[in-house]
């Protein structure tokens, strides 16, 4: 007797349910209702740097860069100070670029080093000249730069503040902000408070002092600043419409993957030359 062959029933095809992406924002983040909205601005400043000539043969000098918001709120000589209608700010990144003026690139001028320093020790290298050796060449993070070409360096500055609330009188200590807690309030009461002048450290550079004439450099410092909590009406004097020098880069709600402060690595994004 022949066996009957039964075909196995195939399991029904389960169709995956495709969920459509919501194009309408939730109620609490529409418009300006969310308080964590962050505004990114690019602010620039230019200066002339002079490297003084050496009094003796083969001497080194050093210089420093510190950064504060007040440096870029005035766009030129005798220009009005830019008023910023935000509650808090944070200097996320700074790019320093120095290029020589009127230098013959075919003649060797020597080289120096650039080193990021994030505390007040940076000021010990301010304006030193006639040094017997390069004091920055053995620092961790030092990069060589050619005096004929200049340098370009991107750093993540850090504000160092002084506190006087100690167990002993007439003494002070230093503290740093963390990356998450680095917001500095702009709108403060009192005429003696200047949050725009908080020093952010910093960059030190060394160089072989030129001979027989000094060398001149054009220096462009670019600030990448984050602001939060737009507050147009909280200023004592309403802001002027003069926004020259300010370039709005990006607005987000704080968790965006395109934010330069989270996606950019200061150690590898811009190499010194």
From Swiss-Prot:
Transmembrane segments: none annotated. GO terms for biological process: endocytosis involved in viral entry into host cell; viral capsid assembly; viral penetration into host nucleus; virion attachment to host cell. One of its GO terms (molecular function) is DNA binding. It is found in: Host nucleus; Virion. GO terms for cellular component: host cell; host cell nucleus; T=1 icosahedral viral capsid. Homomultimer. Assembles in the nucleus, presumably in an immature form, then migrates to the cytoplasm once assembled as mature virion. Interacts with Rep; this interaction relocates Rep into the nucleus. This is Probable capsid protein. It comes from Pigeon circovirus (PiCV). The lineage of its organism: Viruses, Monodnaviria, Shotokuvirae, Cressdnaviricota, Arfiviricetes. The gene is Cap.
